[in-house]
Design a protein with these regions (language model features):
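Conserved short loop/helix modules at catalytic or binding sites
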Residues: 74, 78
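Short S/T/G/P-rich N-terminal loop/turn motif that feeds into the first structured element of a domain
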Residues: 1-50, 57-67, 82-114
């Protein structure tokens, strides 16, 4: 599984435009083969700073998303007008577990919590 962490500092007066563009991109993202999920968060201390956290099955799925023409256009609009700064991190997920899905939890955690 691949995680894409996109931190963006939205330029002054551009937050509504960015959120509208992100809303327009979401249905396209959801159609990408290998897409798992996406969530968006806002910084509690810097309201202009947003984070988008996306998960994909593999790097090929990330590449399919990157290659979409509409996404390329959104990237250009963001770089040219909407973002004062951004950082993108693409990461490999080592483990994925939760309260009820415990198969990948460390053994000591499974022993202690089930």
């Amino acid at each position: 599984m691949i995680g894409v962490i996109f931190e963006v500092e939205v330029a002054a007066g551009q937050q509504d435009a960015y959120l509208a563009m992100a809303a327009k991109m979401r249905p396209l993202l959801e159609q990408v083969e290998g897409f798992i999920s996406v969530e968006r968060f806002q910084s509690l201390t810097s309201p202009e700073k947003l984070l988008s956290l996306s998960f994909f099955e593999d790097e090929a799925a990330v590449e399919r998303w990157r290659a979409l023409q509409e996404h390329r256009g959104a990237q250009t609009a963001g770089r040219n007008h909407m973002f004062s700064n951004y950082r993108l991190r693409v990461v490999s997920v080592i483990r994925d577990y939760g309260k009820y899905e415990r198969a990948q939890a460390p053994s000591d955690s499974r022993e202690m919590h089930g």
